[in-house]
């Protein structure tokens, strides 16, 4: 509860556009993935279709965010069990991703890049090539990082058979993401309920067999490989066209050059800023496969620019709910390994 900020209540007093930066601060290790989930939820409520280029940008940045988040989770997990070197290598690779994020969005951490109906701006010239170059150099380094742990006797003693979560318990407690897949349940919304064009990309969903700390580590390691695989496919077939929905005029503020020269555009800009995008009455629930698990947004609209109710399904909150049961019968020192293998973010848990 120390990171509770009342996000859901704040949403009821802000326009749909104003709430985008607050989604950054849920799983703040993967803000681009949070942005995308929220934007798609509002777009479905508004019955707004975004073009293929926008979908590709969102998938690309979401998978980059997945790698970044898993690198931090892997490094922190290693540090929890005494493997300091893993954190140093992981932070070095994450820094390379942050430089790419900064070039695209203008910010390294809390990006607020995704917009309802599109993204803030198109990709810079040459940026896609630099993303491809990162993937080429990252995979060999990832293998070196994983070698430090995968067959490490001390690491295996700390994780194999420790913190076992059965398939039945994982489902009963609502676990999602790598923690659920580590227990042998191959649920991945990118495969099972694809969104933003994920259905056109080929990738595997890694699953564990025993549901222990070691399996959860292996799942996240393989997910990074699969994210690189998805990124390469996005780059290979990156579509042309607009990076925002052409019919998003009621949501998007017009370009500044038009605002300065057209009275109609100035009025439109004023209405968007002061009253927010006009969303029709209705309700929607959308969930996306984020690095920590399934992030869901339930939004109720009574019309106008401010949501009547917004509920956030936090994967970290659900994943942590099983801790009292998972801790039964294990050593106090093993609780550290269990917590590290769960890879939770309290900002998202407390909201």
Each predicted region: which residue ranges?
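Metal/cofactor-centered catalytic core regions of large enzymes
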Residues: 1-351
């Amino acid at each position: 509860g120390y990171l509770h900020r009342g996000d859901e209540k704040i949403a009821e007093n802000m326009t749909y556009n104003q709430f985008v930066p607050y989604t950054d601060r849920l799983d703040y290790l993967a803000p681009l993935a949070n942005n995308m989930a929220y934007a798609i939820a509002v777009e479905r409520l508004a019955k707004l279709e975004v073009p293929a280029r926008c979908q590709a940008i969102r998938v690309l940045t979401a998978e980059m965010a997945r790698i970044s988040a898993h690198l931090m989770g892997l490094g922190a997990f290693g540090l929890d069990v005494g493997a300091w070197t893993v954190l140093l290598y992981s932070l070095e690779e994450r820094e390379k991703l942050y430089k790419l994020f900064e070039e695209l969005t203008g910010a390294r951490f809390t990006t607020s890049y995704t917009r309802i109906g599109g993204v803030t701006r198109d990709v810079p010239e040459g940026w896609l090539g630099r993303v491809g170059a990162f993937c080429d150099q990252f995979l060999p380094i990832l293998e070196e990082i994983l070698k430090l742990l995968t067959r490490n006797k001390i690491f295996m003693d700390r994780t194999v058979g420790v913190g076992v979560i059965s398939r039945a318990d994982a489902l009963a407690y609502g676990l999602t993401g790598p923690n659920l897949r580590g227990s042998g349940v191959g649920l991945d919304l990118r495969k099972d309920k694809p969104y933003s064009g994920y259905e056109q990309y080929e990738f595997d969903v890694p699953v564990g067999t025993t549901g222990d700390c070691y399996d959860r580590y292996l799942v996240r390691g393989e997910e990074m490989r699969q994210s690189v695989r998805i990124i390469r496919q996005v780059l290979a077939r990156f579509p042309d066209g607009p990076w925002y929905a052409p019919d998003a005029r009621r949501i998007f503020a017009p370009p500044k050059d038009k605002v300065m020269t057209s009275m109609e555009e100035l009025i439109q800009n004023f209405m968007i800023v002061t009253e927010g995008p006009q969303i029709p009455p209705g309700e929607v629930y959308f969930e996306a496969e984020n690095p920590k698990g399934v992030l869901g947004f339930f939004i109720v609209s009574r019309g106008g620019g401010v949501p009547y109710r917004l509920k956030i399904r936090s994967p970290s909150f659900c994943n942590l709910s099983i801790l009292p049961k998972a801790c039964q019968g294990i050593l106090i020192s093993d609780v550290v390994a269990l917590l590290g293998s769960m890879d939770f973010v309290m900002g998202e848990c407390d909201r």
